[in-house]
């Protein structure tokens, strides 16, 4: 039962260092394998319209990073798969659960993507289970990620239906207001929810939402994630598709949630909002910094690879990690 677990989030946790066994952090291996492919980092940019478009997806794939293309350009998905496969790159797309998506999956038989993510806000649903089974029947070699969920029961059901990985996180993201609009979700206790779900999982978990710092990646791995999906830290780059807006001479980029009126084009069942982020530099600079910070984390863990983060001790420091420094 959940009540047996302490409830905490990222800022409440500090990992405890172990003796370092490598000469330099550059020796630490940050790569991770998901399905049949190995990627440079256990990190994937959120499959949102203001985070990536086809060009960003291509850049990530060429660089050896995992990506998941969003599902908001439905007609463009088959040409996108072809574009990636023509260059010898992996194709990784998203689908919903509406009736027409069943026909779409059948159309993929001639050129199946390596990864499909079933992407809906409340993934513990009969509609998701049915879509997992459909994809597994039509495209048995495609790796299926299903979500989003927030309970061990949901993880078990989606895995039993055939999902190869589950995505955990209901509304902890910076531009998600599910917790406010509905009263439900993992906002404020996402890391504890991840831990709770990971104890039931037999297959990989992707932690999705609530990541505010690079250290949160290491914490996610510690509490059971194989991969970490990140939105806001990947938004606002030069390559990011979001609109650039100037305010008082400063450049900002827009970042909005996948269930916002900005993405939907209509104010109906809205569970996302829009924010402006100060424009950042190049995406590759952030990826490089993430890799270096994760290498440092592995060295603090006394390890050589990502999996070594899973065994470190931790302490719960209720909201004191920033010592009153709210700038973070």
UniProtKB/Swiss-Prot annotation:
- GO cellular component entries: cytosol; GMP reductase complex
Q: CDD domains this protein is in?
A: IMPDH
Reactions catalysed = IMP + NH4(+) + NADP(+) = GMP + NADPH + 2 H(+)
Q: Which Enzyme Commission numbers does its entry carry?
A: 1.7.1.7
Query: In this record, what's one Pfam family?
Result: IMPDH
**Highest rank taxon of the organism:** Bacteria
Q: Which Gene3D superfamilies match?
A: Aldolase class I
GO BP term, example: purine nucleotide metabolic process
Q: Could you say which enzyme class this protein belongs to?
A: oxidoreductase
What's this chain's function? Answer: Catalyzes the irreversible NADPH-dependent deamination of GMP to IMP. It functions in the conversion of nucleobase, nucleoside and nucleotide derivatives of G to A nucleotides, and in maintaining the intracellular balance of A and G nucleotides.
Record-stated family? Belongs to the IMPDH/GMPR family. GuaC type 2 subfamily.
- Output this protein's name: GMP reductase
Q: What is the lineage of its organism?
A: Bacteria, Bacillati, Bacillota, Bacilli, Lactobacillales
Gene for this chain: guaC
